């Protein structure tokens, strides 16, 4: 890359010297320094013996002095600006080529924190745009934990009862649907209360389960519509 830049500079320097060049025979010993303007210092003139270095030395001498600008400098300015922009572009590309592998190595070496940062990026953006919503997001796990804790507190007496007296806990489990029914529909709860002795008998003697299941439709019909229940008894007696 450096060789290409140097070659480009040499070509630009030679192209700038073609217009004002003076041809000397190969056997001639005429100093190249005689081509330089007379207002340049003698030290600069003695150094500029190489034709390839003449434009570069001339530019340095003019930049260091306060003399009026020569037409040669105006010819070289666009070329120099082009070279400078090219050099800056090449440097930026080289820097990018050097930095990107380092970033990739860091990301591969520390992938877990990088992925965590990517996961938390929406929350960071949310905290910047809407702090109130971000605070709610932060409090969400605590709200869920509070809900679970309240449920545990409600179930704590039943858990203690199950540990101390399993039979009483079983009765509580049997009566739990009735409690929920009482909260939802009071009329149905009263009906279930009338049927409660049958359920208690079932809890005491599981052998009566089949009889209770067979009689349950008739009992419910008797509680809801006594006239229809009486007709069912008449029809049942006629059949048997």
UniProtKB/Swiss-Prot annotation:
Zeins are major seed storage proteins. The keyword Signal applies. One of its GO terms (molecular function) is nutrient reservoir activity. It holds the Pfam family Zein. Disulfide bonds: none annotated. Residues 1-21 form the signal peptide. Transmembrane segments: none annotated. Keywords: Repeat, Seed storage protein, Signal, Storage protein. The alpha zeins of 19 kDa and 22 kDa account for 70% of the total zein fraction. They are encoded by a large multigene family. Coiled coil: none annotated. It comes from Zea mays. PANTHER family: ZEIN-ALPHA 19C2, ZEIN-ALPHA A20-RELATED. This is Zein-alpha 19C1. Belongs to the zein family. InterPro entries: Maize_Zein_Storage, Zein. The keyword Signal applies.
